Amino acid sequence: MISPSTIVTVPCFSGSPWYLEQLTPLSDWSLRTMRLPEALDNIEAYADFVAGQVVDLDRYILVGDSFGANIAIALATRHPRGLVALVLSGGFAANPITNPITKLKLTAASFLPGNLYQQITLRFHAQSLASPFDVDGQVPLSQSAIRELFIQNTPRRSYLSRMKAAFSANYLGKLDHIQVPTLILTPAYERLIGKNAAQQLVEGIPNATEVILPNTGHMFRFTHPVTYANAIREFLQDHLVGELITR
């Protein structure tokens, strides 16, 4: 009998560990999270870090959200031992900011130092992440709460380094190296990530399935954790049928 895999979650741009207790539909699995290291400025270095986090696992499912999805893609293209499935939410294989105005604003805001970083840069970033569905989610989330998430978890140096990493990485030519079942979770409402990002993943990864979660935005892992986790659960039950899972 195959032993159950561990679900390993990779943080978003904030670097903050996941709130695993909110993912109640996944309670049958062992869950693991982490905090992203500070100031790394390339995705391969982040992938090296995550590889170190799973070195003790015989079987694992990698779940990456947004910036974390880019990291998960980088690791998955290496054919790492033990990886049995991949989940990417709000993810991208190359520079996700295709709107030139949004990119210009983010770049300009990144030059603001000290208190201006918190007051202006993070305020604009929170606005870019927010959706009309956040305040009515299973866990309501305001723009000020999104901004506070970054204030508490993302030093300016790390913000700038992660921007550099996200803008410079390009895995479009390596997506066909991913040989495990892959779920692409896409929010119904998205302003930050370019609209073609999910399509590129679906078309580039050989065994990919896309699920669009209605009435959700980019922060759906935070605002709709039960809906989000249910989609993952259904995917794993369909694709990892040989696992011993207590229901």
Specify the residue positions occupied by each region the protein language model found.
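Acidic catalytic loop of the alpha/beta-hydrolase fold
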Residues: 189-193
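Conserved HGGG/HGGXW glycine-rich cap/lid loop of the alpha/beta-hydrolase fold
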Residues: 2-40
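Catalytic histidine-centered segment of alpha/beta-hydrolase-like enzymes
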Residues: 216-229
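Gly/Ala-rich beta-loop-alpha elbow adjacent to hydrolase catalytic centers
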Residues: 64-68, 72
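Short beta-strand/loop motif that positions the catalytic acidic residue
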Residues: 178, 184-186
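Conserved alpha/beta-hydrolase catalytic His-Asp/Glu region
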Residues: 97-99, 118-176
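Flexible "cap/lid" loop of the alpha/beta hydrolase fold
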Residues: 77, 82, 86-115
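Short alpha-helix in the alpha/beta-hydrolase fold that links the catalytic acid
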Residues: 22, 171, 180, 194-203
